[in-house]
């Protein structure tokens, strides 16, 4: 966990990683959030296997939410989730079940089931039950979640009248925002974190 200076309470962000991690790349992201003025908690899977089903991972992250609620520095009224890679799906699952999650930010996330032969709802099905504002940032060359699927999800979200923003980065691959990921790309990484900071300031920090 990384915490900002000052007595608080501060808005808080739960960071949900993908299959790779947690590692120094995610630790750097937590520290960056603390520099912005947010309590940042990095969730690491405790379930067995490198690529476990979503349900036990979600059950485990509920414990992380419970812990974050116990942190005196964290403002329980201002809670966001950052989902990276498969953590984007877990962010949707968490926001559907926990109304206290006020903002969702997703980096190169939402692996669609047709690509991975995994059972369960598609990301756009999960998103139908989410009311929190959502920012989604994706690379056009993502090999894990094809950009065509993401554009269909954008269309579906707008049809549902959701508060959402989508940003697409030309040439960026899966993992572009995490420094230790093979797909890391400095320029779209900087752009995406600038967007994330703006989105948090607009939809989370200003909440009463």
Task: Walk through the language-model features, giving the residues of each.
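Short beta-strand-to-loop junctions in surface cap/lid or active-site-entrance loops
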Residues: 1-9
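Short beta-strand element of the alpha/beta-hydrolase
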Residues: 9-18
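The serine-hydrolase catalytic nucleophile loop
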Residues: 19-30
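Alpha/beta-hydrolase active-site loop
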Residues: 25, 51-72
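Conserved alpha/beta-hydrolase
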Residues: 33-50
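Primarily recognizes the serine-hydrolase "nucleophile elbow" in alpha/beta-hydrolase
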Residues: 63-129
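Short beta-strand/loop motif that positions the catalytic acidic residue
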Residues: 130, 136-138, 142
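C-terminal catalytic histidine-bearing segment of alpha/beta-hydrolase fold enzymes
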Residues: 158, 163-208
């Amino acid at each position: 966990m990384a915490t900002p200076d000052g007595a608080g309470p501060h808005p808080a962000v739960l960071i949900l990683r993908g299959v790779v991690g947690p590692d120094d790349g995610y630790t750097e992201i937590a520290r960056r959030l603390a520099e912005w003025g947010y309590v940042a908690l990095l969730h690491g899977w405790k379930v067995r296997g490198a690529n476990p089903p979503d349900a036990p991972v979600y059950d485990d992250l509920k414990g992380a939410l419970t812990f974050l609620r116990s942190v005196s520095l964290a403002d329980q009224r201002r809670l966001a989730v950052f989902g990276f890679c498969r953590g984007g799906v877990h962010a949707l699952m968490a926001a559907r079940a926990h109304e206290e999650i006020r903002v969702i930010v997703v980096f190169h996330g939402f692996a669609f089931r047709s690509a991975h032969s995994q059972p369960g709802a598609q990301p756009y099905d999960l998103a139908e039950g989410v009311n929190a504002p959502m920012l989604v940032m994706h690379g056009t060359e993502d090999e894990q979640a094809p950009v065509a699927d993401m554009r269909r999800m954008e269309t579906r979200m707008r049809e549902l009248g959701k508060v959402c923003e989508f940003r697409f980065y030309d040439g960026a691959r899966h993992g572009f925002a995490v420094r230790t990921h093979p797909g890391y790309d400095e320029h779209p990484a900087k752009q995406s974190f600038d967007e994330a900071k703006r989105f948090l300031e607009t939809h989370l920090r200003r909440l009463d």
